């Protein structure tokens, strides 16, 4: 196991996306870059996102834009293709592995066809997507020394507390908790939105869990953030949790492979996307807990294997792909 609690950068390295403008990445990068967007019923957002990514491709920031569609019925695949992305149906990737079992499985299968030496996973339902969602993560890998894995953090505005009887409105311009300095003029949450309202499972489950059980990773603001960039060779050595636990599993497994010193986080400021209902969050929280418990069991820190842990795909490098 590579990861150990006592190594350099014990509190991690944090960057702001503005440190990695497109022209810097185009000038400094030495590796091919692929961007992958897993998508399900995202017709309203996927087109504009892909167009921005295609512009970055033309500017020399990246080389490949792939959308992995989950049999969407709203025209997601068609809009992504029209905007310039390569589109593959998730069920067509590694079909010998059986049915696709969620987002993590889709990411694992996508890795089998992505060509870049650096892979960046982004959300296809981001409502306020801008270039910096890609450049911040790609730049951290391409422009900084000794970085294998870059994870996003951001504010996820939720419903305003002012809308709740007795709730107190939150003034705009709240600072990012523990984040890097935000340049003047940077985007702030819209008036009437609670800047801390989103990411409920992250705040109530994932962060306390990591702080208690993996305290050397407690500096990571959002263990459940789905936006990451990583070296392909690293991703190919990792197992992939198939369900909601993929993000926290990836963070822990990257630590085991590379150590905390090669993990960084990047402040992307504000991320807006559709929120799930409270009832939908319970199975998510259960899966996150079971995924962490599985790793504790594998490490010998939990005697019994957890029940309900999602199926995991083996490291892609362990498969004989034809």
Q: Which stretches of residues belong to each language-model region?
A:
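Short aromatic/hydrophobic "clamp" motif used to bind/position activated sugar donors
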Residues: 119
